[in-house]
Swiss-Prot record:
Residues 28-88 form the v-SNARE coiled-coil homology domain. Residues 1-30 are annotated as: Disordered. It is found in: Endomembrane system. The keyword Cytoplasm does not apply. Palmitoylated by SWF1. It comes from the Eukaryota. InterPro entries: Synaptobrevin-like, Synaptobrevin/VAMP, V_SNARE_CC. Residues 112-117 are vesicular. Residues 1-94 are cytoplasmic. There is a cross-link at residue 63 (Glycyl lysine isopeptide (Lys-Gly) (interchain with G-Cter in ubiquitin)). Keywords: Coiled coil, Isopeptide bond, Lipoprotein, Membrane, Palmitate, Transmembrane, Transmembrane helix, Ubl conjugation. This is Synaptobrevin homolog 1.
C-alpha cells in the first residue's frame, strides 16, 4: 500500500490476494460487523422508542388524573343542580295546588252560601 491512500480495513492488500482463506475470513468478519452495527442501531431505536413511550404514558396518566378530578367536580355540580330542580318543581306543584284550592273555595263557597238561604 502506498502512503497516499488512506487505510481501509476492508480493502484487499497485496498479501491478502495470495491467501483466499484470509479474504473469506475478513469478508465474514465484515458481514458480522455490519450485522452487529445494524443490531446496535435497531436497539438504540428501540431504547428511544421505549423512552418516548414512557413519556407518553406519563402524559396520558396525568390527563387521566385531571379527567377524574373534573368528573368528580361535574358529579357534585350535577347533584346540586338536580336538588335545585327538584326543589323548584316541588314549589311549582305546591303553588299549583294552592291556586286550585283557592279556585275551588271561590267557586264552592258562593254556591254553598246561596243554597244555604
Amino acid at each position: 500500500m502506498s502512503s497516499s491512500t488512506p487505510f481501509d480495513p476492508y480493502a484487499l492488500s497485496e498479501h491478502d490476494e495470495e491467501r483466499p482463506q484470509n479474504v473469506q475470513s475478513k469478508s465474514r468478519t465484515a458481514e458480522l460487523q455490519a450485522e452487529i452495527d445494524d443490531t446496535v442501531g435497531i436497539m438504540r431505536d428501540n431504547i428511544n422508542k421505549v423512552a418516548e413511550r414512557g413519556e407518553r404514558l406519563t402524559s396520558i396518566e396525568d390527563k387521566a388524573d385531571n379527567l377524574a378530578v373534573s368528573a368528580q367536580g361535574f358529579k357534585r355540580g350535577a347533584n346540586r343542580v338536580r336538588k335545585a330542580m327538584w326543589y323548584k318543581d316541588l314549589k311549582m306543584k305546591m303553588c299549583l295546588a294552592l291556586v286550585i284550592i283557592i279556585l275551588l273555595v271561590v267557586i264552592i263557597v258562593p254556591i254553598a252560601v246561596h243554597f244555604s238561604r
